[in-house]
Amino acid sequence: GKPFRQAKMAISGAAGEGKYWCSLGAVLDANQDTPVNSGGGEGGMPPADWDVVYRRDPIGVVGLISAWNYPLNVAFRKVAPALIAGNCAILKPSEIAGLSCMFIAKLAHDAGIPPGVFNIVTGDRDAGAALALSPSVSMISFTGSSLTGSRIMEACAPKLSQVALELGGKSAMVIFDDVDLDMAVATTMKGFLTNGGQICTAHTRLVVQAGIQDELLKKLKVELERLPYAEDPITEKDRGDRAWEEGKSDVVQPVVCKSQQQKILSFIDAARESGIEVLTGGGVPDVTNPSGYFVEPTVLNNVPRDS
């Protein structure tokens, strides 16, 4: 379900992040055991007769739970700093996007990282829960849903483990009546369709000034309903295929897997049942030889603020 260009960019992005963390590792090493001025702090701390040095020690064993929408980047963003800081790392990739994370293990092996320093545990939520609850794991870094993140924080609290959470949400565009409507529609679609809409910065919530709501939604509906669907990116038979390969945002990409497709459709059905207007979309498109799990671009109108 990931556009080819996005996947290619992930490789170069992960390499760039690796270089960045390596540079910080050099700074960390250079500063270890350097003297800290005594007697000049607030309240005379530390006292002038103390010998104080700067030192940062590894945390120990860290559990790293990564997301499926950017599996290589998110995993590398966790693994690289953990190892460079001298920790042992256990990576638990998403069960629906684990192959690129397995490749990180090969890179670690080829680089000569000793056995047991970098490890991968595959599995679903039970594997992640085992990491969070383990008394041998001193820190958890998690990227994913807010609900799961809160549960991880609860699991780590009794053992006072460190926790780093990057949690999802519904990012909003706020549109006022002095805007160029065509530009607003184009910008909305770009965010809505990037990476198949499976990104934390997707413009999936519109807060529109009342005076322009109807006209904006009319334009948005027209543009969404004429979007092509991506087909097999290998054959590149039509515009949809070429757009997928080139990473353009004017084509509907599939979602990551069937369970995610069904989850999205269930949310739309729940909206219908609660009386929310489905302005366009809301189902599975009738496309020829679909190459993935598609959901029609969907607009829900007049959604309650507390939903």
What are these regions (language model features)?
Residues 11, 15, 79, 101, ...:
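Short amphipathic alpha-helical/adjacent loop interface patches that line ligand
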Residues 9-12, 16, 73, 95, ...:
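A generic "alpha-helical surface" signal
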Residues 9-12, 19, 122, 132-133, ...:
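Alpha-helix boundary recognition
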Residues 139, 147-305:
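ALDH superfamily catalytic-core signature
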Residues 21-28, 65-68, 191:
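Mid-sequence acidic-hydrophobic segments that form the walls
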Residues 30-183:
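Rossmann-like NAD(P) dinucleotide-binding subdomain of oxidoreductase/dehydrogenase enzymes
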